[in-house]
Design a protein with these regions (language model features):
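Generic non-transmembrane alpha-helical segments
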Residues: 16, 26-30, 34, 50, ...
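Hydrophobic beta-strand positions in extracellular immunoglobulin-like domains
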Residues: 86, 215, 303-305
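Acidic/histidine-rich catalytic neighborhood of metal-dependent amide-processing enzymes
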Residues: 132-206, 210
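Acidic-enriched catalytic cores of C-N bond-cleaving enzymes acting on peptides and small amides
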Residues: 203, 222-293, 307-334
């Protein structure tokens, strides 16, 4: 009897989702058209207000919450989040769908409008189509179908759209967690529809350690570099040491966890940006850049480490490398500023939500 009921529900949900495919595309397009670039953190309120209208129509009680005082929050770029909750007929556990609303910078080389949401050959193109406005749209459509198929469900359903995931989440999930919105008493199960292979369940993530490294020199006239000390050349030695020593060592470290994609099994580090010398001229000006010897050069690093590694060891490895350069390079001075740290996490593969999703993947896609 229970098996027949499940099969009937599966058929009903499949049909309801099928007839909503066009709505899924349109919702994804609408979300893409709201340019929530982070940094700096644009249009968070606009996307929250859009989601508020959508969720309110299907009976969700919503809250739009500003993460006031968090990193990046300002009157110009306030960090807004939305949480919607819908209670079932009877009490029970809560399933929460969380998606971040921010997207990274656009970059170069686009052949489509990055905020146009254009459909081409069966795909939606735009910044955030994959990461992760498509996932946000999918969770809303799935919940809409579920509510129609199971109007008398038990427990509660929540959907959130949160800010700043791309820059650490302090103005989003972290703030809401500190305020108790994800407490075990309120939420028992969480699904985050981040982009991955559709037949895979991601149970955890690597740790992250972000830092700024600054090397120092002495400013001087460009015609007399011997009178100064070039901070960019000092940074060049740091980058060379990364290439010669650090990156090869990271390549050797491989997790025992079943991680995909393959490259994520290793420890990694990205050099996000580099800035050296004087202020760049106004792009609209025809002036030539400064000819001074630079007295400062800064890089931002993003070190992703394995669950088998310790964040303090990760930090010490960078500092030891810099101290090694200092011991052999005259006038080498540096400063390390920690910007962010995220500890690796792992969900038990026997958790009810994991087993339920695994069963659904097998049912829909025929894959275990």
């Amino acid at each position: 009897m229970a098996s027949d009921k499940k099969n009937t529900l599966f058929t009903s949900l499949s049909e309801l989702i099928e007839i909503r495919k066009e709505s899924l595309v349109e919702l994804t397009q609408d979300l893409i058209k709201i340019p929530t670039l982070n940094p700096p953190g644009e249009n968070y309120l606009e996307i929250c207000e859009y989601l508020n209208k959508r969720l309110s129509k299907i009976g969700f009680e919503t809250q739009i919450i500003r993460a006031k005082g968090t990193p990046g929050d300002s009157d110009k770029y306030p960090r807004w989040n939305i949480i919607g909750r819908k209670e079932g007929k009877n009490s029970g556990e809560c399933v929460h769908f969380n998606s971040h609303t921010d997207v990274v910078e656009v970059g170069l080389g686009w052949t489509f409008d990055p905020f146009g949401g254009q459909v081409f050959e069966g795909k939606v193109y735009g910044r955030g189509a994959c990461d992760m406005k498509g996932g946000l749209a999918a969770s809303i459509i799935a919940v809409e179908a579920f509510l129609e198929a199971c109007p008398e469900y038990n427990g509660a359903i929540e959907i959130s759209g949160t800010a700043d995931e791309e820059t650490g989440g302090y103005g989003g999930v972290a703030y809401l967690a500190e305020k108790g919105f994800f407490s075990p008493q309120r939420v028992q199960h969480v699904i985050i529809p981040e982009p991955l292979h559709k037949d895979r369940i991601c149970l955890g993530h690597r740790g992250g350690w972000w830092a700024e490294i600054e090397t120092f020199g002495e400013i001087a006239h460009g015609a007399m570099p011997f009178a100064g000390d070039c901070a960019v050349r000092h940074m060049g030695e740091v980058l060379n040491e990364f290439e010669e020593t650090l990156f090869p060592n990271l390549k050797k470290r491989v997790t025992e966890m079943p991680v995909i994609p393959e490259g994520a099994k290793n420890s990694t580090m990205n050099i996000n940006s580099i800035h050296g010398g004087q202020v760049e001229p106004d792009p609209e000006s025809n002036a030539l850049p400064s000819h001074c010897v630079p007295d400062s050069c800064r890089i931002i690093i993003d070190r992703r480490f394995l669950i088998e590694e310790n964040v303090e060891e990760v930090k010490a490895e960078i500092e030891d490398l810099l101290e090694g350069i200092k011991s052999r390079r005259p006038k080498f001075k540096y400063e390390v500023t920690e910007l962010n740290r995220v500890i690796p996490s792992m969900t038990d593969k026997e958790a009810p939500i994991v087993k339920s999703i695994a069963a659904s993947i097998e049912k829909v896609l025929g894959k275990k």
